[in-house]
Amino acid sequence: MAADLSAAEQAETENLQYRGGRLYWSGGSAAAAAGRAGVKADKREGDGATPAGTYPLVSILYRPDKVPAPRSQLPVRPLTSTDGWVDEPADVNYNRPVSLPYPASAEEMWREDDLYDALVVIGYNTEPVISGAGSAIFLHVATPDFAPTAGCIAVKREVLLGLLPVLSPGSKITITGRDDQATGGRVVHIDGSSANSWYQPASLG
């Protein structure tokens, strides 16, 4: 269920854009990592590329043992240790969440690291789902050194948590290649100095 938000937080739809190793929104920008193979229009399962294009931001998943329930107009759901996401192209539930154990290959969403402490599901390859076109594309927490991802977009945890309250149904992310094509998705600027002002560190507890 979406959390209750103030009128100011519901004022307008916030859209995001990734380009050249940074994530942009109306209030600023921050360093971001993309796929190790860069940004591609013809993404395939397992190629390490981030899909180019504009996609809806669908919902939020979070680790209830690590962060409080995020405030957002998007649907918010806590992860559990049995959550998975199918990455087997031949399976009927390809690119869909499932409960583990599952008979086909599926990514474990309850990770030992911090990358999925909170994430936004990006609506890539969903309507319809095309076998082999790529799965489990998220906006999630970056590694400390902003290492390239397997195809997702990743930012600092405080940046991600700060953006969640202003995302709403209708919010989209536009992903373009440009400068990141030459670096395989590795970020050049990792300062994070443009992290937005909506985030309050005390809210993490």
Tell where the protein language model's regions lie, with residue ranges.
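A conserved hydrophobic position in a structured secondary element of the catalytic/binding core
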Residues: V155
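Short cysteine clusters
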Residues: C152
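Cell wall/extracellular polymer interaction/catalysis modules
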Residues: M1-T149, L160-G205
